[in-house]
Amino acid sequence: MASLPEPQKLARNFARCNDWEEKYLYVIELGERLDPLPDEWRNPENLISGCQSQVWIVTQPDEQGVLILHGDSDAAIVKGLIAVVFSLYQGLTAQEIVELDVRPFFESLALNQHLTPSRSQGLEAMLRAIRAHAAALL
């Protein structure tokens, strides 16, 4: 599994960036930490609709019920957004993912204010897809 920061550390690192260019570079760097997605997972079933870029997300429960998240995108900034989302959900069960509202975290970063409308819609589509996958396991 990718080495992603815990949400609190992610927020601290984000706050240390001097401007939005640095924040974007940090998000892109987080995306580079994601494990490669196997080609067989790049299929229509795992493709997230509602994203301008191609985004694939795969969820797999482990033996303790924790959801393991895998994802990729053909756009560097979107791949970074996937990593940010995964850092919020890492280590959680399907029930915890369904119950967790991550929107306040994104609001605290003011990220949506600096994303294009299509990127914001794509981010929402990713969140909905992960929650739907988690809910289907309950």
Curated annotation (Swiss-Prot):
Coiled coil: none
GO cellular component terms, semicolon-separated: cytoplasm
Main location: cytoplasm
GO annotation terms (biological process): iron-sulfur cluster assembly; sulfur compound metabolic process
Alphabetical list of SUPFAM superfamilies matching this protein: SufE/NifU
Active site: 51 (cysteine persulfide intermediate)
Localisation per UniProt entry: Cytoplasm
Keyword annotations: Cytoplasm
Pathway listed: Cofactor biosynthesis; iron-sulfur cluster biosynthesis
The protein's assembly and partners: Homodimer. Interacts with SufS.
Protein family: Belongs to the SufE family.
Functional note: Participates in cysteine desulfuration mediated by SufS. Cysteine desulfuration mobilizes sulfur from L-cysteine to yield L-alanine and constitutes an essential step in sulfur metabolism for biosynthesis of a variety of sulfur-containing biomolecules. Functions as a sulfur acceptor for SufS, by mediating the direct transfer of the sulfur atom from the S-sulfanylcysteine of SufS, an intermediate product of cysteine desulfuration process.
Protein name: Cysteine desulfuration protein SufE
Organism: Pectobacterium atrosepticum (strain SCRI 1043 / ATCC BAA-672) (Erwinia carotovora subsp. atroseptica)
